């Protein structure tokens, strides 16, 4: 049996899947659970989900647990993450002014050239002054990024060593070279910045999961979904939490692929997961998820994190509705649950309840205080500019139904506009899916696939505005947890060969040795070695393996090439292990 859990900003969802075929390849959904996420007590939320699922299973039968979460993505979208100081070593030839995205920034004078040679050492006094400035502001998080650090991490390591020697009180530190082997200084510093910004959120998440599993004596393989739809063991997440920052949106996309016929029918479609805090937008092209091999974007900044194409709009069922300067504003903040459930602010969920769109939903029926929802909207309307919102008044009195309808129309318009902007941005550009590069392909979706709490209410309204067919994903309220559960277990192998130093590293296998006499490699052979070791470590010679990163450069001494340094990362290709019974074929 497999458990999938998605920890969202509003709800924590869970599913229990069991094998339903003699060959062990088919799965069925045995139990589901959905509870409110308690951000100040994540362990309790996870335990509540586990207890419902374990009521339908025996602990020894659980062979794998896969988690996803939108917690980190939400704090980035809401710009509610911890402040981060940036230590940048950009070298010459680059104006760094547009790169100063830290809450405090240090620009250092040392640099590494494109061959990996340290041309200029750091100036310690310059560094110490900058660190003191960051410390004085009470910033506890630091990202250290040097240009060409993948070819020589020495300057980044030197900064870290000084921080430790001087006992600076930084709690979370990221080094740029540890997060990706690919070049791209601007993308690397953004990656390191956000990696540091979400460390405390992820640490709380990992600790809550570990404690919950210990409480229920679950001793099994535990994984977290990555941005690319692959998985990483829970105990390795903190090495690079940025790799899982979009695990929530990835789970939604994998769940859509698992529970609908989009892949089998080779449909071009928009996938929506309308949550309480955000709406996650994904894209399928001819049945396959769109992919960003160069790196996803976070708040408009490009990173080096490979991932499924998605965009998180800070707009959900529990987004705070407010009036500013007489104008209605929805999100990006979320104050808590809807007013109908005791929350402090009106939300789109309150508007849906007033319109009777979700009154019969089992998750709301009997629990929602409709009067509280109405009162919250009425109180809000008093601050509106009547000249701009005239449709909401009849004979000088507020038409509450019309006002609630206006709120939902505004929410839908934001989602539709974002979808249209996404499609416009991809016009006349090469687009990748998880399998191939597509050039000259027109992206004209005709299908809208929705999941999330209000999916059944909003899907037909959105489809009408877009001119698409629409389909609510089966098990829409927990389909993201299904996507996490059914994600193919992946592992990766990093092989680094330094022919100048005559050394071979197969990192995850723990092999670090001198090259043997006559042993030599070119880049293609290093790739073959990485793929072979990935299959060996997975104990599956038929596993589909892909190269996720490759890097090769000459080692120069005395104006002469004396060897090469090559680094390759291979991984089992992300995908689904099965499609569950009850999905659309």
Task: List each model region and its residues.
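N-terminally biased helix-coil "hinge/interface" segments that flank
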Residues: 1-585
């Amino acid at each position: 049996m497999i458990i999938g859990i998605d920890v969202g900003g509003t709800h924590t969802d869970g599913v229990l899947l069991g094998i339903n075929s003699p060959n062990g390849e088919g799965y069925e959904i045995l139990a589901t659970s959905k509870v409110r996420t308690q951000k100040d007590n994540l362990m309790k939320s996870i335990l509540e989900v586990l207890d419902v699922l374990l009521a339908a299973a025996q602990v020894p039968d659980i062979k794998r647990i896969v988690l996803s979460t939108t917690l980190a993505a939400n704090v980035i979208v809401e710009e509610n993450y911890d402040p981060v100081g940036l230590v940048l070593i950009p070298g010459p030839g680059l104006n760094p002014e547009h790169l100063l995205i830290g809450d405090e920034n240090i620009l250092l004078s040392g640099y590494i050239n494109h061959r990996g040679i340290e041309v200029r050492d750091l100036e310690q006094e310059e560094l110490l002054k900058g660190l003191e400035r960051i410390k004085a502001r009470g910033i506890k998080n630091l990202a250290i990024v040097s240009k060409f650090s993948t070819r020589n991490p020495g300057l980044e390591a030197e900064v870290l060593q000084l921080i430790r020697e001087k006992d600076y009180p930084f709690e979370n530190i990221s080094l740029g070279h540890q997060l990706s082997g690919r070049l791209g200084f601007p993308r690397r510093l953004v990656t390191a910045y956000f990696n540091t910004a979400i460390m405390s959120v992820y640490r709380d998440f990992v600790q809550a999961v570990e404690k919950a599993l210990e409480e229920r004596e679950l001793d099994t393989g535990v994984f977290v979904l990555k941005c690319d739809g692959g998985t990483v063991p829970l105990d390795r997440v903190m090495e690079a939490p940025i790799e899982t920052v979009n695990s929530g949106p990835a789970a939604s996309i994998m769940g859509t692929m698992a529970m609908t016929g989009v892949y089998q029918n080779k449909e071009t479609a928009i996938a929506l997961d309308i949550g309480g805090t955000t709406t996650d937008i994904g894209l399928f092209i001819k049945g396959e998820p769109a992919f960003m091999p160069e790196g996803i974007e976070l708040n408009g900044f490009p990173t080096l994190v490979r991932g499924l194409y998605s965009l998180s709009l800070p707009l959900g069922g529990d987004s705070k509705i407010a009036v500013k300067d007489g104008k209605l504003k929805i999100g990006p903040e979320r104050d808590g649950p809807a007013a109908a459930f005791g929350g402090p602010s009106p939300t789109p969920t309150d508007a849906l309840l007033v319109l009777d769109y979700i009154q019969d939903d089992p998750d709301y029926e009997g629990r929602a205080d409709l009067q509280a929802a109405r009162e919250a909207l009425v109180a809000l309307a008093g601050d509106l500019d009547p000249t701009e919102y005239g449709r909401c008044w009849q004979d000088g009195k507020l038409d509450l139904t019309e006002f609630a309808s206006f709120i939902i129309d505004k929410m839908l318009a934001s989602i539709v506009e974002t979808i249209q902007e996404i499609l416009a941005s991809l016009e006349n550009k090469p687009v990748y899916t998880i399998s191939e590069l597509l050039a000259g392909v027109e992206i004209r979706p005709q299908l809208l696939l929705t999941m999330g709490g209000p999916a059944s209410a909003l899907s037909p309204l959105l489809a009408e505005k877009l001119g698409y067919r629409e389909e609510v994903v089966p098990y829409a309220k927990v389909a993201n947890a299904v996507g996490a559960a059914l994600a193919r277990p992946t592992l990766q192998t990093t092989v680094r060969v330094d022919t100048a130093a005559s050394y071979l590293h197969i990192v995850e296998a723990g092999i670090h040795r001198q090259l043997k006499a006559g042993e030599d490699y070119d880049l293609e052979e290093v790739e073959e070695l990485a793929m072979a070791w990935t299959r060996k470590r997975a104990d599956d010679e038929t596993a589909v393996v892909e190269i996720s990163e490759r890097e090769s450069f000459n080692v120069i001494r005395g104006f002469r090439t004396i060897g090469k340094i090559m680094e390759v990362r291979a991984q089992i290709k992300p995908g689904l292990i099965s499609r569950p019974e009850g999905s659309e074929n």
